[in-house]
């Protein structure tokens, strides 16, 4: 079975929110649990490195720029992110869900995944994980979580 970093991250993310989250308190215990579930040690280590980089690259809290410069994606980003993913990032930034620093962190974390291409669903998970890790982004995280798990999309005001 070909696992990916994203599969390990999704499992970690979903497990973190389960009632059993208190059972795993340290990295070694969590790694052993992931191995028992069937993930390879190599993919688990890559996922932990991905999370460490996410934690290390928290953007500073700044006011969002209004009508700032437009971010132009370059070759590898265009190759990896499908059109829907790119449009989704633009939408999130235009609606104030992501500021420019958070967008860059999302792009960095998306590019760090070991997949050749990311679709819209993959991008939504990356955004959700980045927002979860951002202090002061609770409202944006809650909105994003509603979009992913709610029955009806919530309107932005």
Swiss-Prot record:
InterPro entries: Smg. It holds the Pfam family DUF494. Belongs to the Smg family. PANTHER family: PROTEIN SMG. This is Protein Smg homolog. It comes from Xylella fastidiosa (strain Temecula1 / ATCC 700964).
